[in-house]
Amino acid sequence: MPASAECPPGPGPVQLVLLAALLASSPAALAEAPHLVRVDAARALRPLRHFWRSTGFWRSAGQGLSYNFTHLDGYLDLLRENQLLPGFELMGSPSGHFSDFEDKQQVFEWRELVSLLARRYIDRYGLEHVSKWNFETWNEPDHHDFDNVSMTTQGFFNYYDACSEGLRAASPALRLGGPGDSFHPPPHSPLSWGLLGHCLHGTNFFTGEVGVRLDYIALHKKGAGSSIYILEQEEAVVRQIKQLFPEFADTPVYNDEADPLVGWSLPQPWRADVTYAAMVVKVIAQHQDLLVGNSSSSVRYALLSNDNAFLSYHPHPFSQRTLAARFQVNNTRPPHVQLLRKPVLAAMGLLALLDGEQLWAQVSQDGAVLDANHTVGVLASAHRPAGAADAWRAAVLVYASDDTRAHANRSAALTLRLHGVPPGPGLVYVTFYLDNQLCSPYGEWQRLGRPVFPSPEQFRRMRAAEDPVATAPRPFPASGRLTLRRELPLPSLLLVHVCARPEEPPGQVTRLRPLPLTRGQLLLVWSDERMASKCLWTYEVQFSLDGQGYAPVSGRPSTFNLFVFSPDAAVVSGFYRVRAVDYWARPGPFSDPVRYVEAPAQ
């Protein structure tokens, strides 16, 4: 059955929910000239689009075919519950039925399957939701991994036409792109280049017309350990596409596997810590400044994504290409899984604080202006308010990154000057900071002796290093100008968040639900869909044995919509509620309380 391509197969619902919800510098040994970062909060440059975010049986599809959607329903329901949208690759051969897409009967059957699938989820979730999905062709067709399906060049074109017409039969609003491959220069990558030619000049298998729609061009270009190499390859491919197929000059371009390095399971120490986190931010800043926001660039760049929806395995819980470190804890009955946020997920939480209007920002050193292809860079944004629950805010995200290299005794001297901040009620600023000394669960795991099955206390110690270090809100200078001086280790991230006080406190937390982890531990997840402001200090989690008197159980501030409750007493049966607290210590309404009753020990 066609399904979203995420590996490895078989994670349980708790792991999927956790993945879905997951997100002191040393003196410099090598002296460098200080970096000056200037940001003008009154000078908006351009929009800042975040290019980087029932029964299971169905009626017969004809020809005596029927499909069991039970597992796919469950997975897509879980994504929907966690407010996520899939990139949906139309690939696979249910029960081995499909074997040859030059067989006309199978081409018609594939079209019917795609149409059936699309209609099913339009009926289930609504067209408004499903039309936001990115449907895409078979993953990396030039690698010829077709699950025992014979896929000639003509067969691949027939398959594409069936995907296109199947989706169109369900709704013309559904988009389809491809080929999701590397586009090596011709004569290499014949299916990728051939698909572009077919979409322009080929004959549609079903309509007989010349040409087939291609709503976006999907590339897979990775960095070989270099941040700028990703962008350089994208530009080279787009130049060649425009040279060979100028009709695609205005077609949106996706790089939905823009990873720093190939090989998700290859253990790399830098993937475990802030090195990876800072590099991801650097790649995004490079794309915004050198491509998306560059008026001289003709690339219609629409989406950057990383291929990191994997679950790590022993003995490399942290160092594979994942967002979370996975521990398979086999010394409990039954065995269970624990996931820890890696710094790369924490960095994505910082990126989420950026808003929709890019601000003028510049980095210089010794008087020379530096572009985004240097060790220190910046991305800044502002938000104009809409409504009483909202107010003006700005975010300045500074990275210090030497790509995949970490330098224990090297730092960058930074002077950050933010000016042009308009006066506003209760104006405050908060800083968030990530480095390998303060924010590394991996480093804590090493200090604990790299336990294979960490104890609850050891997990608590590692989780204490998951989030950025946050400084409490401080009044913003009345002059509208702020100067901060820092030594930024390589690697590190610093975000400065400036907020005026909204008239209203935070909205209500919704969709609170508890999920069991193991005996004496549970996971709470919730939604922030009613939060009109991003200026939140923390979520306060409270617990009650009887639903009457509640007490806080969350400690350090965190704005991730997830909390692991692992008390020393291992008593977790009771009632839970959560509320948001903003930068001005104003709480929002509590969520509706939920009750959790732990299953008796077996």
Protein language model regions, located:
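Beta-strand-rich modules
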Residues: 565-588
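Short beta-strand segments within Ig-like beta-sandwich modules, predominantly Fibronectin type-III
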Residues: 475-476, 553-560
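Extracellular fibronectin type III
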Residues: 581-602
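Aromatic/acidic polysaccharide-binding cleft in carbohydrate-active enzymes
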Residues: 257-403, 407-409
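Substrate-binding cleft and catalytic face of glycoside hydrolase catalytic domains
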Residues: 62-227, 240, 247, 263
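C-terminal beta-strand-rich structural cap/linker in extracellular carbohydrate-active enzymes
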Residues: 453-502, 576
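Carbohydrate-binding surface patches
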Residues: 368-445, 491-497, 534
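Conserved aromatic anchor
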Residues: 520-535
